[in-house]
Amino acid sequence: DSGTVYLFYNSEQIDRVSYLEDWQFSLLDNSDGVSLERISPNASSNQQSNWHSAAESIGFATPGRVNSQYQYVGTTESISLQKDVFSPDQDGFEDILVVNYAFSESGLLARARIFDDFGREIKTLFSNELMGTSGFFTWDGVNGDQAKSPIGIYVLVLEVFSVDGGVILAKKIPFTLAGKL
């Protein structure tokens, strides 16, 4: 799809963008329902490089919210856990592992996997997922066999790469799955 969008304020045109379907992320199988998001309000509206497909991790759209591909000035790559201990016992207190991220560029893909203390992969959270420039994802403690993982030490391995396969970031973050004994 292609078209032109006009922005008016008090009947005066203040901005406009003419876009083409090939502005969507090139590795999407289907761009139907995927929003194009402006990366920076400071760059030209008609500059193709200032637009990117909304991140898969937020449902390919951000109506009423900050764009998933919005570029924060001064952002550098960062990955952090909200807490390094969680207890998925449904008591309403730290039941999920929350992983926050921020990247300095848009259009990055990522793979997130969980390993146990013996180095065995127990769960792939996602693979080749188009990420926003900032956001979070979670793990509920359920392993690849759809069973609750046992109490112990685990490692999150997050690999972030560009479309051409270049590794942007590879990080291992240890954390603890706690519970009642």
Task: Name every feature range the model reports, one short phrase each.
Residues Q71-L181:
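Short loop/turn motifs at secondary-structure boundaries
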Residues D1-Q90:
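Intrinsically disordered, low-complexity linkers and terminal tails enriched in Ser/Thr/Pro/Gly
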